[in-house]
């Protein structure tokens, strides 16, 4: 993975950062790097995620899925319990991985009606084992399996903490299971069993994913000028300080579209503290050049645009044509067209003074996706260090969870009373 932040410099962008200020910031990056390294070694909460490439045991994951040869994998989880796995399987082309990460009844019913439940591996993921959406969906899935004549205990694997309702369930029914690693928040758990199990069940090389993460670990250095991950985290921080309060993540590869969703959770939930942090926006190149690019180029100069692409792509040739107006396309390829659009977008943003950063992978393979995920996690952690916030908590999210649980009769929570006290001004 490499990072090019030339278009985020003050010479190119309205909210860009000067070379001199980056030199000054680099002293803080060095100090933050030392703290991060010490916390990784101590496996402190949150920082332990940066040790996952070596701490994760791929054999334990393969063992958990060894009794299955699924036609499909259905992950029942939400947030970090689903997005990392979805990112990895999508990037690696494992199309038979599905997720239930919402409790919208219509798509849930449609998916369960379409899946071959007798040959589907159901992967239930919740660190606490108490996540309301996950448990509700699992109960719905279990009933659908029973209605289809499938013994759910024969087709279910669990990833959860060492204790909790899901762990109790797994032990009671002797279900194959993996343990969510200690000290790793869900949104940082992609390089653990949480993110890797569906890929392993579908025959992907999770050891190569971990090797990519290990390469990302090796690339961390006490200078933003020597570490791609820290370069990105530091430049994102510096541009936010200059008014770039939105970070638009734009992969130029459809297989990375779930990565943008994963990134949005990572960035928002980790950095949205104390009135600080960048708001993540998601787009897809080249599709959203025909929608969002107008805003990014001609709207407010309050954005950092992050463009992501693999250098190597599959080849699809564009046929020659006798239509004069289309002759410039004939003999080219879809990948050359997509790369041209990437570079044109990058240049157009720079010409408009909108800071942008290029992130490139050698190729979109198991090693590449592992390195990308690790790099973004390290960048996020560095950003949090520079902001001086608690990166690994999510108190605002917990408020909503308590309110919802109280409304459903799952306990006496004062947050639920705030919902009842809502001011109503309805127009009908």
From Swiss-Prot:
Query: InterPro entries, alphabetically?
Result: G6P_Isomerase, Phosphoglucose_isomerase_CS, SIS_dom_sf, SIS_PGI_1
Catalytic activity annotated for this protein?
alpha-D-glucose 6-phosphate = beta-D-fructose 6-phosphate
EC top class, as a word: isomerase
Q: Which pathway does it serve? A: Carbohydrate biosynthesis; gluconeogenesis; Carbohydrate degradation; glycolysis; D-glyceraldehyde 3-phosphate and glycerone phosphate from D-glucose: step 2/4
Where does the chain cross the membrane? none
Q: What is its EC number?
A: 5.3.1.9
Q: Does the keyword Isomerase apply?
A: yes
Question: Could you tell me where this protein is found in the cell?
Answer: Cytoplasm
- Chief location category: cytoplasm
* Keywords tagged on the record: Cytoplasm, Gluconeogenesis, Glycolysis, Isomerase
GO MF terms on file?
carbohydrate derivative binding; glucose-6-phosphate isomerase activity; monosaccharide binding
Q: Which GO terms describe its cellular component?
A: cytosol
HAMAP family, per this entry? G6P_isomerase (MF_00473)
Q: Which PANTHER family match?
A: GLUCOSE-6-PHOSPHATE ISOMERASE
Functionally, this protein is described as follows: Catalyzes the reversible isomerization of glucose-6-phosphate to fructose-6-phosphate.
The family this protein is said to belong to: Belongs to the GPI family.
The molecule here is called Probable glucose-6-phosphate isomerase
């Amino acid at each position: 993975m490499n990072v090019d932040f030339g278009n985020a410099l003050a010479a190119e962008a309205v909210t860009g950062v000067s070379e001199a200020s980056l030199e000054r910031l680099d002293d803080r990056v060095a100090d933050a790097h030392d703290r991060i390294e010490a916390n990784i070694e101590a496996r402190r909460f949150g920082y332990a995620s940066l040790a996952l490439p070596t701490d994760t045991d791929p054999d334990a994951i393969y063992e958990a899925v060894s009794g299955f040869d699924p036609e499909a994998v259905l992950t029942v989880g939400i947030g970090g319990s689903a997005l990392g796995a979805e990112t990895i399987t999508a990037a690696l082309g494992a199309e038979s991985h599905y997720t239930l990460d919402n409790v919208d009844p219509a798509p849930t019913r449609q998916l369960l009606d379409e899946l071959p439940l007798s040959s589907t591996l159901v992967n239930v993921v919740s660190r606490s084992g108490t996540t309301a959406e996950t448990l509700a969906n699992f109960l719905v899935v279990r009933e659908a399996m029973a209605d289809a004549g499938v013994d759910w205990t024969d087709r279910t694997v669990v990833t959860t903490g060492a204790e909790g309702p899901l762990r109790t369930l797994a032990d009671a029914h002797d279900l194959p299971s993996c343990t969510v690693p200690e000290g790793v928040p869900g949104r940082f758990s992609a390089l653990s069993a949480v993110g890797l199990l569906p890929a392993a069940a579908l025959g992907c090389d999770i050891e190569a994913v971990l090797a990519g993460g290990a390469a990302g670990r090796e690339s961390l250095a006490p200078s933003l000028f020597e570490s791609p991950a820290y370069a990105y985290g530091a430049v994102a921080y510096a541009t936010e300080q200059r008014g770039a309060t939105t970070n638009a993540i734009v992969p130029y590869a459809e297989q990375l579209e779930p990565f943008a969703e994963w990134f949005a959770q990572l960035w928002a939930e980790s950095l949205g503290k104390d009135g600080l942090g960048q708001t993540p926006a998601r787009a897809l190149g080249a599709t959203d050049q025909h929608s969002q690019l107008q805003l990014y180029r001609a709207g407010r100069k309050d954005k950092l645009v992050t463009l992501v692409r693999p250098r190597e792509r599959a080849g699809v040739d564009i046929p020659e044509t006798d239509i004069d107006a289309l002759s410039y396309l004939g003999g080219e390829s879809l990948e050359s067209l997509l790369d041209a659009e990437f570079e044109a977008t990058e240049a157009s943003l720079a010409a408009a003074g909108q800071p942008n950063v290029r992130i490139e992978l050698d190729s979109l393979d198991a090693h590449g996706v592992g390195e990308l995920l690790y790099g973004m996690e390290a960048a996020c952690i560095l950003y949090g260090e520079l902001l001086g916030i608690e990166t690994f908590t999510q108190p605002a999210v917990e408020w909503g969870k308590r309110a919802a649980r109280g409304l459903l009769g799952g306990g006496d929570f004062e947050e639920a009373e705030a919902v009842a006290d809502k001011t109503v001004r309805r127009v009908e």
